[in-house]
């Protein structure tokens, strides 16, 4: 059968290519099953699917989905490890640093939160959310003056920033 297939199609069977295609197919199945599970509220199954997908292929987008599920499942330690790995893979991705800062806030690690927010500001100076998170970190470290300075900067950048005004 393989002889006729290769004879009529003009291609020889390449087992390595088939293996790679199968691996890619399995990766996509796990990734999209995880996305469906996440939408249905099945965090445990979503974590399992995303973990299996990442075992097959390291993918930034899938890591982001897995970090979201960890946050939703109240597993900030796992989310933080994954987000720190993501910042090493793509160090110019502002939203990863913002998410990391939020996770650090959940853990009450204000120094790490400030560091993540400062990195986001270094990438994108005009990001009001980064200044707001830095202000929250300053507030957590009892640095009132810097807190006010960063919150003021956030309000200047985004005039209708209600959260910054309330803090």
How would you name each of these model-derived features?
Residues 1-24, 41:
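Helical anchoring/docking segments at protein termini
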Residues 19-61, 65-72, 102, 106-108:
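Alpha-helical segment of the N-proximal tetratricopeptide repeat
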Residues 24, 57-58, 91, 125, ...:
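Short coil turns that delineate tetratricopeptide repeat
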Residues 27, 60-62, 94-95, 128-129, ...:
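Helix-start (N-cap) detector for alpha-helical repeat units in TPR-like alpha-solenoids
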Residues 40-48, 73-85, 106-119, 140-153:
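Structural signature of tandem alpha-helical TPR/SEL1-like repeats
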Residues 133, 140-167:
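Solenoidal tandem-repeat scaffolds enriched in leucines and small polar residues
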